[in-house]
Design a protein with these regions (language model features):
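Short, surface-exposed patches at the edges or C-terminal ends of soluble domains, predominantly
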Residues: 2-298
């Protein structure tokens, strides 16, 4: 190689090395990025831990009134319900350990059977059905409630996921059920950037009335809740902090997340029921109150 070519090569190498050194260092031929000279200082968004509420205490157990006679509880699993067996497991364990019977309404015995099944039970649990109830099923459910049967329904916000074919939206189908009970469920999720419990969608709720359902419930932790709109004939049971926002309504407010209309209770979340979540804060008190409501012991 001629001397002139050597000089040009050395010059090019020096320029490249200097450019790389501005933003990083070279170690054994590998570019290693340098850490930023300053840490982010924007509160809340870039440092969300500054907005976290103290984590809820994981303690307590579910105790219910043991004086009620044996009852049979039906859990709906026939309407493409979201993770129904996982979310109903704690309810099932508490009920059966107190001498009550739990049965599932399964897809294989769905057609034409709902009317018969509800006539055999004392209460019904419905967890996030993503398939609509038929007109016959809704009529049977209304008749069941009018005759003194009790229903607890857990709903959820709309969810969007992505698969090989694109976006898939899953929506809980409770609107046709709830029209008879002066309660409607939203489709958006609730969140709180200023007082959440770990993540922005993990929110705190507290009692909104002096009903037995809200007794000893001062700090419930909800994981993916939607809001409820309550008519004059229904009563709010739980509400969020006033700094809570909605992904659809886009405003801070104290949103209702549990409500009652006579023999029907609606809750805007079901994840708090699971084995890993029911011990957080006052969740076990809420679960116990809901079970006593099902058993007509409230």
């Amino acid at each position: 190689m001629r001397p002139g070519e050597w000089a040009r090569l050395v010059a090019v190498f020096a320029i490249v090395f200097a450019a790389v050194s501005v933003s990083g260092v070279v170690i054994s031929g590998v570019f290693m990025p340098q850490p930023p000279s300053e840490q982010p200082t924007s509160p809340g968004v870039l440092a969300p831990e500054r907005n976290l509420a103290p984590p809820p205490v994981e303690a307590g157990s579910i105790e219910i009134n043991g004086t009620t006679s044996q009852q049979t509880i039906l859990i709906d699993a026939a309407h493409q319900n979201t993770q129904v067996r996982d979310r109903a497991q704690v309810l099932t364990d508490v009920l059966t350990s107190n001498g009550h019977q739990v049965s599932y309404y399964n897809p294989e015995n769905k057609i034409g059977q709902f009317e018969n099944r509800v006539s055999e039970v004392d209460a019904i649990v419905i967890i996030a059905p993503t398939q609509r109830y038929t007109q016959a099923e809704r009529t049977a459910l209304n008749d069941f409630v009018n005759e003194g049967g009790r229903v607890v329904l857990f709903t959820e916000p709309k969810r969007t996921s992505v698969n090989l074919f694109g976006e898939v939206t899953t929506r809980v189908r409770t609107e046709s059920i709830l029209t008879s009970y002066a309660i409607s469920a939203g489709t958006g999720y609730l969140y709180n950037l200023n007082g959440n419990v770990g993540t922005f969608q993990t929110i705190a709720a507290t009692s909104a009335s002096n009903q037995r359902l809200a007794e000893n419930v001062e700090n419930v932790t909800l994981y993916t809740s939607t809001s409820l709109t309550v008519g004059d004939e229904a009563t709010p049971v739980l509400e969020t902090q006033p700094t809570t926002n909605s992904s659809t309504l886009r405003s801070n407010a104290s949103y209702t997340v549990a409500a009652r209309h006579g023999n029907v209770v609606v809750v805007g979340d079901s994840e708090f029921l699971t084995e890993q979540n029911y011990r957080k804060g006052d969740n076990e008190e809420l679960v116990g109150n809901l079970i006593e409501f099902l058993l007509n012991a409230d």
